Amino acid sequence: MKHLFILLSVVLSCFSMIAQTNNNHFVGMDLSMLTKYEEHNKPYLDKDGAEIKDLLEWIPSIGVNTVRVRLFVNPTEPNAKAPEGVCQDLDYVTRLGARIKAAGLNFMLDLHYSDSWADPTNQKLPASWNDCVTVDQKAEKVYNYTSEVLNTLAKASAAPDLVQVGNEISYGIIGINVHPYDNAADNWDGFVKVLENGCKAVRENCPNAKIIIHTERSGNAEQTLYFYNKLSNLDYDIIGLSYYPFWHGYMDKLEETLTTLGNSFPNKEVQIVETAYYNSWFPSSGATYNTSTTWEASDAGQKAFIDQLVETLAKYPKVNGLCYWFPEEAGCGDDTDWNATNTATVIQNWINRGLWWPEPDAKGHWPTSALYSLGKYSTSALDNINVDFSDNRQKYNLSGQRISNPNRREVYIQNGIKKIGL
């Protein structure tokens, strides 16, 4: 009896032109601190307890095909291991980006245009840009800086596949203020001009990359719509959202925003470029919503959140990306001395949203259950291609075509099982 299997449209790191395929799901991790954890931490383990030799080489096996890395202009502590993780200068990002590309992964570059964190409350001009006073000067600086960064990365075989022009820019960028609602003091003309120059630099210097405009109002559909309506003439590809339920609300709020964006911007893709949830110790302060009553701060609760998020996003055809923020976190990074000074750690304080547990007495760090749930997003879009897998010896690519010998790192199907060529 012949068995028919539905071939899932899985997009993994083996495709060199992954960013140009229409039905891709980008399954991502923001691994901006990976280098520091590799230098100052025990190895990462898989669910069977085996040591992961190279995390970038391993993550395609669980369905991850994209890695996001932030870039600061002149980070405040480029050589420090603490306290904030603000160490990603161009040299750091170039070296990590080259590793990402060599592993066959998509590289998402997150341009902060700042010396430190750029977010809704901080969009400061880099100190070395203080001579840029007018909008025209700032726009020109963004164009030149973006071009320089992309050329440097390209020369190092680290050209990004996706580029964020700004990070969580709902309220402005490099000191030019706007709001996602009516405010008489806003400078939307100046704001858009700066973005235009950043996007222009990407198109000219990295023409195959997709451009992301990233905000964090995912829990407010009205404000999100207001913001992106202001960018109606901007040349970009993807609406990028941060979604942290403890700040942005429950899944129904996100769904309202996704529905609004899908109806209002049918020509734009949508991605959740940042999300995370607690695996322990829900904070006693700082959270807008006590979501621990829905998803407890535990291994099971973190997994339940990711499972529900993957299921939710699969309902929206314009949504094609999900990226987990800081999954490489495993405590502060020094597990030989829990009382070590800050200079001996990767970060100063535990955030407790990583996808590995800090295990001081183990041979390495064990993964949380949510790690393996994240990769499910890669299989949540179905092409419904019927393929005859009755002959166990035959191999098939992800288009349903029979192949003889898969290339190295090529994903293929044999006997109904997804495998990767060696």
What are these regions (language model features)?
Residues W58-K210, H214-E216:
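Substrate-binding cleft and catalytic face of glycoside hydrolase catalytic domains
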Residues V411-L422:
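C-terminal tail/sorting-segment detector
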Residues I52-L56, D189, E204-K210, G219-T291, ...:
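Glycoside hydrolase catalytic-domain groove-lining segments
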Residues T379-R402:
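Residue-level detector of functionally pivotal "anchor" positions at catalytic/ligand-binding pockets or at interdomain
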Residues H25-L31, V67-V69, F107-L111, D161-V165, ...:
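Hydrophobic faces of well-ordered beta-strands that scaffold small-molecule active sites
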Residues T260, S280-T291, E296-Q308, T312, ...:
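Aromatic-rich peripheral "rim/lid" segments of glycoside hydrolase catalytic domains that contact
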Residues M1-T21, A381-L382:
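Bacterial Sec-dependent N-terminal signal peptides
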Residues Q20-W58:
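Boundary/entry segment of secreted carbohydrate-active catalytic domains
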